[in-house]
Every structure is written in C-alpha cells, then in structure tokens.
Amino acid sequence: MDNYTVAPDDEYDVLILDDYLDNSGPDQVPAPEFLSPQQVLQFCCAVFAVGLLDNVLAVFILVKYKGLKNLGNIYFLNLALSNLCFLLPLPFWAHTAAHGESPGNGTCKVLVGLHSSGLYSEVFSNILLLVQGYRVFSQGRLASIFTTVSCGIVACILAWAMATALSLPESVFYEPRMERQKHKCAFGKPHFLPIEAPLWKYVLTSKMIILVLAFPLLVFIICCRQLRRRQSFRERQYDLHKPALVITGVFLLMWAPYNTVLFLSAFQEHLSLQDEKSSYHLDASVQVTQLVATTHCCVNPLLYLLLDRKAFMRYLRSLFPRCNDIPYQSSGGYQQAPPREGHGRPIELYSNLHQRQDII
C-alpha cells in the first residue's frame, strides 16, 4: 500500500564526508572558516574604527603641529596615509559579511588594489624611515643638506608608483571566491593570489614574502648593525626607542607569522604537507595569522604617538583645552619630590591626571 517510486541511480548522489576526504585531492578539501560572518563583521568594523581614529590623529598632529619641514615627518605622514589606504576595503568586506551582498567585480578589483597598494606603500615607507634615520645619525647635518623636502616628496611619489605597479596582478586578475554558488568578494582569502594557477601561486607568494618580509627585514638588520657599530652604550639604550626602528620591528613581527604560514601553504606539495589534515591546519593558520597581520595598521600610529608621550600629551591638551582645568586629586598623598641638584633635568609631567616621583 505504500505509494512511492524508486528514483534512478543517476538522479542523485549521497555525499559522505569521510569518503570525500579520503578520495579527494588536497586542492578539493573544503577550506575551514575560522570566523563566522558575524565575527568577520565585528573584526572589520573594530579594526577600521580604531585604525581610522589612530591614523587620522597622526596625520592631524603631523600637519598641524609638527609640520612637514623634515623628511622624517614626511615619511611618517606617508606611512599614515598608506595605513588608511590599507583600511579602506574593510567596511565593504564587513557589509559583505553582514548582508551577503558582494560588490561588483570591478569594485572588488579596486578594493583589492587599494588594499595591496597600501600594504606595499607601508613597506616602502618603513624602509625610507630606516634609511633616513641611519643617514641622519651617520652624516649629521650633511644629511639634511643633501636631502631636501622636495626629495622626500619625490621619494614618496615613487614609493606609491612602485606599490601601485606591484599590486596590478592582484587587482587585474582578481577573481572573487565561490561561496554557496555565488562569487563573493570578502575578507579571508589571500588577495594577492587572484588565480589558482600553480605557477602564478608560486610567483605571487614569493613576491609577497620578499616585499613584505625579506626585503624590509634585510634593511632593518643592516641599519641596526651599522647603528650599533657607531654608538656608545648609552646611545644604544636611546636608539631602541627610536620610532623608525620600533615601528618597523613591530611590523615585521606581525607579518612574519602570516608570511611563514603562507609559504608553507603555497608550497605544501613540495614540503610533504599535501595531506588533508595538514592542508586543513594550514588554511586555518593562514586565517588566524591574517587577522594578526591586519591589525598592524592600528598599532603603527599608536607607537609613533606614544613613543613621544610628552609631545603627544601636549598636543592633546592643545586640542582639548578644558582638560588643562581638571584638578589633580591625589589618592594617597603621593607627591612629586623636587629634583636634586646636579642630577640632570627634572622629569616633566606627561599628564595632568598622573604624576610620578623622580627616583635617582
């Protein structure tokens, strides 16, 4: 009495995941999604908001207070603008994660091009800062004589031209990834790998590692070694707090894990890592390290501002004059002791809300 019909064998297939993983190659294993769409939305919005605030504040302080009469400030301004360019695609990727609506293919290419151009311009800005810092230290006043502001502007223009040219493969050949039968331009896929051809994958991965990690690391090591040879012990202690060295060092630390995992993922066939388990863990590691690397654009301006805390607080007090009228209330009667004679300059207050004692 049962009314049913038997479907032909070729009408449907039953997919068993274990059989799929056992019988499929490493390129066919579904990539893991480390973050849910809601988490991608929160991450992109948070990084964009913090990075926008930090970099706009850095640009404002550089233009209004510090001025652009020396090369260091010009290069720091170029670095902040590069960070903003790197941040621009994040709101669009957040919208894609929230609503599932991807922008057009042309818009995706532009966003990916901006993202890559901003990253490469940051690398060149860090290198310019390192080289200029070394020249000022080694040549003294001669560096400012032979290197003018116009030369710095030309160097920044050339840096942007090179960054744009190097990002052309990402923007021209970019193809949004396929998700649920739809092409999706979203955060997560390495955007410098626009196509899946093995040769292009190797070439673009090598380009990314050389430009973002190997080249700036080499310049960083050379500059540090040359500075150490020319410095006394006291000067070395101060040198560790120079913004150019600190910012570049933190940049390399945040991008080194991503580039390392990326190298293993791209060349896994040649490193005996092509099994399903290794591929899965490599894909997950790429996503995790990409999150860490993306947040560097929020850290750079904070380091630049906080390494010179006294000047930064002075600029903030000039921006918000009412903060100067807030009386300081000591919680435990802790007061600043007067400086002793013959022991150098007194320590300046870097905040009207906090005081500390000069300990000799």
Swiss-Prot record:
Task: Name the source's superkingdom.
Answer: Eukaryota
Q: Which gene encodes it?
A: Ccrl2
InterPro entries, from UniProt? CCR1-9-like, Chemokine_rcpt, GPCR_Rhodpsn, GPCR_Rhodpsn_7TM
Annotated organism of origin? Mus musculus
Identification of the protein by name? C-C chemokine receptor-like 2
What family does the Swiss-Prot or TrEMBL record give for this protein?
Belongs to the G-protein coupled receptor 1 family.
Q: What is its main location?
A: membrane
Q: What are the disulfide bonds?
A: C108-C185
- Return the GO cellular component terms, semicolon-separated: plasma membrane
- Where found, per UniProt? Cell membrane
